[in-house]
Amino acid sequence: MSKTTATATPKGKTNAPCAPQAVLFDAYGTLFDVYSVALLAEQLFPGQGQALSVLWRDKQIEYTRLVTTSVDGAHYQPFWELTRAALTFAIKKLAASADFTRANTEFDSKVEQLMNQYRSLSAFPENREVLQALQARGVPTGILSNGDVAMLTLALKSSGLHPYVDHIISVDAVKKYKTHPAAYALGESTLGLPAAKVLFVSSNGWDALGATWHGYQTLWVNRSNQPFEELGTPPTRTGSSLRDVLGFFPVSL
């Protein structure tokens, strides 16, 4: 495990916010590497694994937005089902020439293999170190995720992170996916703190933006050196790994 500490860059507000009293993490893309399925995808679909994993993720997020903006949430589906639907779409789009059909047993087998892999995504290497440090400093922690509780619990247990997370918060409780305000409000109600006193951490720029709009202090973990969303609201800070969370919670002397 690398011990190199990245320096977080302050962004945006000129008035320093109050020190946060708790931290919430996004799960998929932040704690868990959603592209770690690419190796298996490449084995199943030679030459298309990386493209498949990217399209799968993009379509997954697109589907969350589609069902959230439907009238009164009439078309809401749990995240696991949207993830499966997105994978099915991605395979059909990229592997059309492979002569698969939805009823084909081999097609279904490959979907199941990739879905099983998604249950236990790889965690980023610094995660345990950071979560242990937060626990040692007495900082309450939680996950606020589009994933359902069963998905999140299994992912945490399989990665060994479960003992270091105090709260598992799923948008399934309100049936509105991020960036809907009702999704972010779950963090406040669970922690019993206003958003301004909570740090929200995400590696997804759109998620960091939505959390900032809601009033959270935010850390955007920009692992791949991407530009931030061009909508006029920067995160509180930008970092390059989860270790930058610890800069918000210095050790007391």
What are these regions (language model features)?
Residues 2-20, 132, 144, 148-253:
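Asp-based, Mg2+/Mn2+-dependent phosphohydrolase catalytic module
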Residues 11-61:
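Active-site neighborhood of HAD-like aspartate-dependent phosphohydrolases
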Residues 39-40, 55, 85-89, 113, ...:
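Alpha-helical elements of Rossmann-like donor-binding domains used by nucleotide-donor carbohydrate transfer enzymes
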Residues 41, 56-60, 83-84, 111-118, ...:
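Hydrophobic alpha-helical core bundles mediating ligand binding, dimerization, or RNAP-core interactions
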Residues 50, 63-113:
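A metal-dependent, Asp-based hydrolase signature
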Residues 80-81, 100-143, 153, 181:
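Short, acidic loop-to-helix structural element flanking the phosphoryl-transfer center
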